[in-house]
Amino acid sequence: AKIALSGVTGKSQSLQAGKLTLELDARQGETTVKGNLASPLAANLEKQTVELPSFSGELNVANPQMPMKSVKLPLTGGLRADIDGQTAALHANTQFDESRIAAKVNVSRFAPLALVFDLDIDKLNVDKYLPPKPAAAEGKEAGKPAPAEKPLDFSPIKGLNASGTVKIGQLQVSNVKASNVRLEVKAAGGKLDVAPLSANLYDGS
């Protein structure tokens, strides 16, 4: 990652920058992540607070295993962090394909990470991003039971304590369509719970 500041003013304990720029270029396995971000910056070294009042940029993620191969996400929003108090607040907006997404995150502890969030998506067609199901095999292969699915690995979120709400205006999964979907999500102790609070089915589904 590369970070640059321009238009820096202020005293030793408090400074402002007209523009902070961040460039990211990372790779893990087959996944590559490239991005850039720009924002004014306000920092108080004595109080250990940092604020990016208005950032914008984009994030590009590519992996040959993804149905779309690569995804470009425009980003806008703002961030404020209190390093000493271990709190932060983030609001961000992006667009993934035909989905407009707005997120709010409030962090109450950095380590181990604890946060609450709200995620609002206007519409999402999950079927569009899933790989096609293989055609049924013929003859003896057709009579064989399908291989057991591997259990999901939640070890990466073992130390995470998070809760929040996901709202989706229009959702399609396995050709089932629903509107005004509201989900409650909780992650703690390496477990992930997703509970539907409400949803309206439509189009005869």
Positions of the model-derived regions?
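Membrane-proximal interfacial segments on either side of biological membranes
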Residues: 4-88, 97-195, 199-204
